[in-house]
Regions:
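Membrane-interface extramembranous regions
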Residues: 1-150
Length: 150
């Protein structure tokens, strides 16, 4: 039996599915890991990135503020990764990253701010991809195709 060549639609569907799954994994796991690290400071001492202008106006210690930030990041990551509202949570993660980038700019960490802005744009791409990706992902999964055809 000769295997037929993939159609351009099948190639496109696989590419979209791969991009979608990758972005969903990245914007699910990275916020969860960063959020958990706000409680342990294993990766970095997060307090040092809080701009003095912000540290002076928040009604708590910087470490407590970072714990609140960590909880928000964990919830956002779980929302992207494990809920049917990936699109909404991807927008939230992107906006959150812009907020972090603004703090980093105020603190003088321009290089890290640029990286967070690029991540925000990527998160917005995931949100937009959610409009077409679930159908493309289903089209590339043999188990789902078999269930649809009976």
């Amino acid at each position: 039996m000769v295997k037929s060549m993939d159609t351009s639609a099948e190639v496109r569907d696989r590419a979209v599915a791969t991009i979608y799954r990758t972005l969903k994994l990245v914007f699910g796991l990275v916020p969860i890991v960063a959020g958990l690290d706000k409680f342990t400071n294993i990766l970095v001492h997060w307090d040092r990135y809080l701009a003095p202008a912000i540290a002076n106006v928040i009604p708590m210690k910087p470490s407590s503020f970072m714990h609140v930030v960590g909880i928000i990041e964990i919830v956002a990551g779980i929302g992207v990764l494990l809920t049917p509202w990936t699109r909404v949570f991807a927008w939230i993660v992107g906006l959150w990253l812009i907020g972090i980038a603004l703090d980093l700019i105020l603190a003088g960490y321009y290089d890290i701010a640029v990286r967070d802005l690029v991540m925000a744009i990527s998160s917005f791409c995931l949100a937009r991809l959610c409009a077409v990706a679930p159908a493309r992902v289903a089209a590339t999964d043999p188990r789902l195709r078999q269930a649809q055809t009976g």
